[in-house]
């Protein structure tokens, strides 16, 4: 029996979204239970681009996640607060989001959320931090049929339009996903070194994809965000029909309790995951693996910490 890891969903109604998507993201960021992690994420984002030039322009207040080596202790003592040297090469940077909006992203994640909604949360979180720090954000999004791009901008209004593209373009009626098509566009259009954030689901590592990851990680700071697939063998009774969004193959309910199916699925899943992990680790790519909304901030924090440490 061959068990794949294609995108799985269940037949449940999806309510349309009204209002600002960015406002929803910010509301999640500043919930009392997540505020500390959000401030840490903000600090690590601020540090990720920072170099070590010989001169510094001015001082600013310390943010959790800043490097201790950047603290100006004398100035801090005079000001009665912890101050950080702002190095001369701290300038406006660019963050390019490469987001899969194909049919696969309209499926459910490991935690039950729609993958496209997690993609909105990830892009909105990092995009909001970037705009807060005066950086520019851009978007390359699409599927196997169409790839669209939004130019670099540094406003919340522009970020809101990007989030709306991600949300509205991904549905069960969309063409199938093609991360390779998005990465081809990125390689053709990104001329200057940028922070590139790829948001996709768990895809198989082809020779083409491997070559793209090697090329992009050599030219850019690369962060790979993997939205975790639902486990078709773990779907419970009463959730509705379980089917593969690519081929619309429906899983018979009797197979969900098949021990052989579970074992083969777990083996193939582990093999795919290990191949991808080895490549990304070898190329120095930071990885965030997110299965639900609540995982977004801690996993992004972990990825930016790894990115920051890798540059030292």
Can you annotate each of these PLM segments?
Residues 2-51, 56, 60-69, 75, ...:
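Exposed, interaction-prone extracellular/peripheral surfaces
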């Amino acid at each position: 029996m061959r068990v794949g890891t294609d995108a799985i969903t269940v037949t449940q109604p999806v309510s349309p979204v009204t209002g600002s998507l960015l406002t929803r993201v910010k509301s999640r960021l500043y919930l009392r239970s997540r505020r500390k992690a959000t401030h840490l994420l903000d600090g690590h984002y601020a540090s990720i681009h920072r170099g070590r030039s010989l001169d510094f322009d001015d001082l600013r207040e310390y943010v959790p996640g800043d490097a201790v080596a950047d603290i100006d202790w004398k100035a801090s003592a005079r000001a009665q607060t912890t101050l950080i040297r702002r190095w001369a090469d701290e300038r406006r940077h660019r963050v390019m989001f490469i987001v899969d909006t194909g049919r696969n992203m309209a499926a459910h994640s490991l935690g039950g959320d729609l993958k496209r909604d997690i993609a909105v949360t990830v892009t909105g979180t990092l995009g909001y931090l970037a705009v807060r720090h005066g950086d520019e954000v851009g978007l390359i999004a699409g599927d196997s049929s169409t790839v669209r791009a939004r130019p670099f901008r540094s406003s919340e209004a522009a970020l809101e339009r990007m989030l709306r593209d991600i949300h509205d373009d991904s549905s069960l009626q969309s063409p199938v996903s093609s991360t390779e098509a998005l990465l081809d566009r990125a390689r053709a259009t990104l001329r200057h070194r940028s922070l590139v954030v790829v948001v996709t689901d768990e895809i198989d590592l082809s020779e083409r994809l491997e070559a793209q990851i090697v090329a992009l990680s050599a030219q850019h700071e690369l962060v790979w965000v993997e939205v975790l697939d639902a486990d078709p063998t773990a779907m419970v009774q009463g959730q509705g029909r379980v089917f593969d969004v690519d081929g619309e193959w429906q899983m018979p309910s009797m197979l969900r309790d098949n021990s052989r199916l579970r074992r083969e699925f777990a083996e193939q899943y582990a093999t795919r995951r290990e191949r991808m992990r080895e490549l990304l680790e070898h190329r120095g790519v930071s990885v965030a693996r997110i299965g639900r909304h609540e995982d977004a901030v801690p996993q992004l924090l972990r990825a930016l910490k790894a990115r920051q440490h890798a540059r030292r």
